[in-house]
UniProtKB/Swiss-Prot annotation:
The chain crosses the membrane at residues 527-547. The keyword Transmembrane helix applies. It comes from Homo sapiens. Its main location: membrane. Glycans are attached at residues 215, 266, 331, 400. It is found in: Membrane. Residues 1-31 form the signal peptide. One of its GO terms (biological process) is positive regulation of response to cytokine stimulus. This is Leucine-rich repeat-containing protein 70.
Length: 622
């Protein structure tokens, strides 16, 4: 455009434009520290560089700052200046010993602050000043032993606070004053012995509280009373031992209660009073022995109940009566149950899953009622006999009456019954009964001498019925018989049958045939169950393989569109402000023990063009 005569003005214009462009790019080009691995202006990665202090001259447009894995002992108020757009600051695993008050005062748009896995021993008031928009604060795996009152005063927007695995022993009055937006509080794996009655003041919006693995000896019911919105409470791994009356008063919205491995031996009558909306209760790994009608009488909406790995030996018939319409899952495995009356389970009309394995079941007549109830129920429950030894390992559903009642009749015990003043027999009747035993009984094969005795309950044996029929006809003519031992040279085994006297040869042959048929049917049933199990496993394997193939195809299809999954995207969205939010409580039963860190969601709000452009980002590990 410029000729030779205008070369000097053109040169001046060129220099002016160049200087202007350099000024515009100054913050992007010259603002990044040369020691950092990645500096895009939006994201700065200074991970694992052994830095002893925070570098200077970061661009003001920085959104992510990664300082993980360094050797930064102290953070003062002059090190994090000018970062007005910073959203996430990672200072974890950096050997931090102390953070000075007002160290984050200029980070007014900070949403996520990671100070976990350091050596911070104390938190002084003013340390979080200026963090009015902070949502998530991570302080786990430090050495904090005490939190002074008011230290969290400035965190009015924090919804998630993680203080697990510190050295806290006492939560004093007003520890969390000012945290009116807090929804999740994790205090697990500390040494907390006592919680002040006003320790949770201002936490009316708290939804999830994790106090597992501390040293609480009783439920701090007075401290819980202010937590009107609490939905999930974990007290597992505390030496509580007993649930005192009204331990959970005020927690009307509580739905999930974890009391695993808390040495609980007793639940008082009103122990669960006030939590009528409870849905999930976990009492695994405790020392409960007896369950009665008062234990769970107030939990009318309970859906999920785990009682495995206790020492339960008895359950009253009406223990689960009030939760019959709601309870769907019940776990009674790994206890000391030997019998269970069907009336215990009959009220549970909504039950879909029952576990009772690994109990020392005694397969006798007491379990026949349970077997019959299970046969008519839609619930699948595998109970295997532990006693008697002859039935060990056999499934309850294969046990029938012939296996349950088989006994020998001993004459010596019959004489003990005869000795009773209420029972008298004619000598003639006794001899007739003895003649019937020796003539119509089982073949006499053994020539050894032994004592033959009868059951105590004479009416249940044919010989006893014979005595009664002949002895009580004319009680005035009866003669008392002295109890003496009768020595016989044969052993007599009398099998009890329902509608017959002592078996004759024909009855004996019929009984043997019936027993053989029963055993064959049992073997066929067992074989069928084994084949059915293999078939189900094969179907599951086929479905799993199909699922994996479909998943693999989806991955291949996704890889065609993008070679690499990225968590952050740049320069694809118009100027806007994006609000970062996180889901509060995961309600999956599998996540009850510890709070999972939820995936972050972003909601876009359009702003005028003259405001600073903020990138859209996703972060799956916050």
């Amino acid at each position: 455009m410029c000729g030779l005569q205008f070369s000097l003005p053109c040169l001046r214009l060129f220099l002016v434009v160049t200087c202007y462009l350099l000024l515009l790019l100054h913050k992007e080009i010259l603002g990044c520290s040369s020691v950092c691995q990645l500096c895009t202006g939006r994201q700065i990665n200074c991970r694992n560089l052994g830095l002893s202090s925070i570098p200077k001259n970061f661009p003001e447009s920085t959104v992510f700052l990664y300082l993980t894995g360094n050797n930064i002992s102290y953070i003062n108020e002059s090190e994090l200046t000018g970062l007005h757009s910073l959203v996430a600051l990672y200072l974890d695993n950096s050997n931090i010993l102390y953070v000075y008050p007002k160290a984050f005062v200029q980070l007014r748009h900070l949403y996520f602050l990671f100070l976990n896995n350091n050596f911070i021993k104390r938190l002084d008031p003013g340390i979080f000043k200026g963090l009015l928009n902070l949502r998530n604060l991570y302080l786990q795996y430090n050495q904090v032993s005490f939190v002074p009152r008011g230290v969290f005063n400035d965190l009015v927007s924090v919804q998630y606070l993680n203080l697990q695995r510190n050295r806290l022993t006492v939560l004093g009055s007003g520890t969390f004053v000012g945290m009116v937006a807090l929804r999740i509080l994790d205090l697990s794996n500390n040494n907390i012995l006592r919680i002040s009655e006003s320790g949770f003041q201002h936490l009316e919006n708290l939804a999830c509280l994790y106090l597992g693995s501390n040293n609480l000896t009783k439920v701090p019911s007075n401290a819980f009373e202010v937590l009107k919105s609490l939905r999930r409470l974990s007290l597992s791994h505390n030496p509580i031992e007993a649930i005192q009356p009204f331990a959970f008063k005020g927690l009307a919205n509580l739905e999930y209660l974890l009391l695993k491995n808390s040495r609980i031996r007793n639940v008082t009558r009103d122990g669960f009073s006030g939590i009528n909306n409870l849905k999930h209760l976990i009492l695994s790994h405790n020392d409960l022995e007896n369950l009665n009608s008062d234990t769970f009488s107030l939990l009318k909406n309970l859906i999920y109940l785990k009682l495995d790995r206790n020492r339960i030996i008895s359950i009253d018939n009406d223990t689960f009566e009030n939760m019959g319409a709601s309870l769907k899952i019940l776990n009674l495995s790994f206890n000391n149950l030997t019998a269970l009356h069907p009336r215990v389970l009959k009220p549970l009309s909504s039950l879909i899953h029952l576990q009772a394995n690994s109990n020392p079941w005694e397969c006798n007549c007491k379990l026949l009622g349970l077997r019959d109830w299970l046969a008519s129920s839609a619930i699948t429950l595998n109970i295997y006999c532990q006693n008697p030894p002859s039935m060990r390992g056999r499934a309850l559903r294969y046990i029938n009456i012939t296996n349950c009642v088989t006994s020998s009749i001993n004459v010596s015990r019959a004489w003990a019954v005869v000795k009773s003043p209420h029972i008298h027999h004619k000598t003639t009747a006794l001899m007739m009964a003895w003649h019937k035993v020796t003539t119509n009984g089982s073949p006499l094969e053994n020539t050894e001498t032994e004592n033959i005795t009868f059951w105590e309950r004479i009416p249940t044996s044919p010989a006893g019925r014979f005595f009664q029929e002949n002895a009580f006809g004319n009680p005035l003519e009866t003669t008392a018989v002295l109890p003496v031992q009768i020595q016989l040279t044969t052993s007599v085994t009398l099998n009890l049958e329902k509608n017959s006297a002592l078996p004759n040869d024909a009855a004996s042959m019929s009984g043997k045939t019936s027993l053989i048929c029963t055993q064959e049917v049992e073997k066929l049933n067992e074989a069928f169950d084994i084949l059915l199990a293999f078939f189900i496993l094969a179907c599951v394997l086929i479905i799993f393989l199909i699922y994996k193939v479909v998943q693999f195809k989806q991955k291949l299809k996704a890889s065609e569109n993008s070679r690499e999954n990225r968590l952050e995207y740049y320069s694809f969205y118009q100027s806007a402000r994006y609000n970062v939010t996180a889901s509060i409580c995961n309600t999956s039963p599998n996540s009850l023990e510890s709070p999972g860190l939820e995936q972050i969601r972003l909601h876009k709000q359009i702003v005028p063009e003259n405001e600073a452009q903020v990138i859209l980002f996703e972060h799956s590990a916050l």
